[in-house]
């Protein structure tokens, strides 16, 4: 039979490894060698062993975990005669303040523990139920699902006093709904009943009798009764607060949620900050917009934020009455109360520069010169640079290189020289000179004036026949007169009456180099 290897046990992290030395997990040298023939009482791992029976009983495992955290199970009240008969393992005169008392094992196996217990000690300290309240074997260590639900509802602001029917039937239905896991435990052979009609009134911490099908409002959470009820949650006092008074009928403006599976629904009241910094209460469920505070900034509750974020995830598109489609950018807008589109804000150090550049790019195409026609570009004469251009060390403005003797250059009508490979791509984008912005197409001025007047709302037919212009706009009349003068100048140059060309209007007497 092959012998088992020697195991090394780390006392710092409870790691087990076979190679001697420091612990490979935490690098601690507080290790101990465990041989295969080590007695169980000498095994350092015995403290971490869990009995196999505890896996079949979750309640016993939970008690073991609570005891390891320092939260012992303490019987808080004197058991009755009936309970002493049913539970022979209990002491006849238990001390409520004793810390070494052990629970009845039969209670863990059958699961019949009392529902009139306090909130878990791991959350609220060593608080115990009141002695003499008639509650048998109150165990603060047992976690009650209904108490956990009420605990989170208190934190989320969802456990305010709610209206409840005065009938005994509705009260019994509410008790069964609030504690469904323990309804069977109350009916299985328990002869002793608490004196109070509602056993949960004696639980440690805060108890708020709230129906699950009626989520409370923010208006009710501001009442003094709610503050007195929820204040002992984080205190270690053993005195339970009295239950708050129950109104006889629902107040106006409170919405009712008919689905009991979603107690954290959107509230009907929210708070808002006014212009002067004062808090105002706004009823969001009313249809009258006059009830809302003018100029108030809403402080949305968690339920409304989740409803806005996840309310339309499954919607294929924005349809009337179904909300907006899901947009990740709207998440930050709802949380931080951003007005407008988040893309309109300047985020980061270069945010403002990016917005200005985007606006300039959008406005560039409105008044930018049109590209030169291909036939005009093809008719341009390609030549060698003249000698005086070489002597003056002229350079191409586009590529910023000096002209050489063997370079192919093109002279524009404005008398400026450029490289052939530089000016042709330029003219295909911008039909003007790169130096003086003079158009290379003689007919481009007429087309630009026509397009400008069309954009301003004027009829281009008036320019074709200026004598029929009947507009009263002074600016349009001046443009017509300018166009007439330019047309007469073009006609006179074609008949030889003048040697001035239309291009001379854009060229200075001394061209720029």
From Swiss-Prot:
Residues 72-113, 155-262, 439-513 are annotated as: Disordered. Residues 239-248 have a biased composition (Pro residues). The keyword Ligase does not apply. GO terms for cellular component: cytoplasm; nucleus. Signal peptide: none annotated. A zinc finger (RING-type) spans 396-437. One of its GO terms (molecular function) is ubiquitin protein ligase activity. Residues 82-106, 229-238 have a biased composition (Low complexity). This is Uncharacterized RING finger protein P32A8.03c. It comes from Schizosaccharomyces pombe (strain 972 / ATCC 24843) (Fission yeast).
């Amino acid at each position: 039979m092959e012998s088992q290897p020697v195991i090394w046990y780390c006392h710092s992290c409870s790691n087990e490894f076979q190679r001697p030395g420091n612990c490979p997990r935490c690098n601690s040298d507080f290790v101990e060698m465990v041989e295969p023939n080590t007695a169980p009482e000498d095994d350092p791992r015995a403290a971490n062993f869990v009995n196999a029976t505890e896996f079949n009983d979750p309640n016993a495992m939970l008690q073991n975990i609570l005891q390891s955290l320092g939260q012992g199970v303490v019987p808080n009240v004197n058991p009755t005669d009936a309970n002493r008969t049913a539970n022979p393992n209990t002491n006849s005169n238990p001390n409520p303040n004793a810390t070494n008392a052990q629970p009845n094992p039969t209670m863990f196996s059958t699961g019949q523990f009392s529902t009139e217990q306090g909130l878990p000690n791991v959350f609220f300290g060593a608080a115990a139920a009141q002695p003499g309240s008639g509650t048998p074997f109150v165990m603060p260590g047992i976690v009650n699902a209904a108490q956990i639900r009420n605990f989170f509802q208190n934190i989320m602001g969802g456990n305010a006093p709610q209206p409840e029917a005065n009938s005994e039937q509705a009260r019994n239905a509410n008790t069964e709904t609030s504690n469904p896991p323990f309804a069977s435990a109350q009916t299985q052979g328990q002869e002793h009943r608490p004196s109070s009609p509602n056993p949960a009134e004696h639980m440690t911490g805060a108890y708020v009798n709230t129906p699950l099908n009626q989520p409370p409002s923010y208006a009710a959470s501001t009442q003094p009764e709610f503050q007195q009820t929820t204040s002992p949650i984080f205190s270690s006092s053993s005195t339970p607060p009295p239950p708050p008074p129950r109104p006889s009928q629902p107040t106006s403006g409170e919405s009712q949620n008919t689905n009991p599976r979603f107690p954290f629904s959107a509230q009907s009241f929210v708070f808002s900050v006014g212009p002067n910094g004062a808090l105002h209460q706004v009823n969001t469920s009313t249809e009258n917009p006059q009830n809302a505070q003018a100029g108030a900034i809403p402080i949305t509750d968690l339920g409304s934020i989740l409803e806005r974020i996840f309310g339309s995830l499954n919607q294929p598109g924005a349809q009337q009455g179904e909300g907006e489609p899901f947009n990740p950018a709207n998440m930050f807008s709802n949380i931080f109360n951003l007005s407008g589109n988040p893309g309109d804000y300047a985020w980061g150090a270069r945010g403002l520069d990016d917005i200005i550049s985007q606006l300039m790019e959008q406005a560039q195409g409105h008044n930018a010169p049109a590209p030169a026609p291909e036939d005009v570009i093809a008719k341009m004469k390609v030549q060698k640079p003249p000698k005086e251009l070489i002597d003056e060390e002229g350079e191409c403005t586009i590529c910023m290189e000096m002209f050489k003797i063997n370079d192919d250059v093109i002279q524009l009508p404005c008398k400026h020289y450029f490289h052939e490979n530089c000016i042709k791509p330029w003219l295909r984008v911008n039909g003007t000179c790169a130096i003086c912005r003079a158009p290379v197409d003689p007919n481009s001025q007429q087309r630009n004036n026509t397009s400008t007047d069309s954009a301003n709302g004027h009829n281009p037919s008036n320019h074709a026949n200026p004598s029929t212009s009947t507009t009263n706009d002074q600016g349009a009349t001046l443009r017509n007169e300018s166009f007439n003068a330019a047309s007469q100048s073009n006609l006179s140059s074609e008949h030889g009456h003048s040697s001035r060309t239309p291009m001379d209007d854009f060229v200075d007497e001394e061209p720029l180099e």
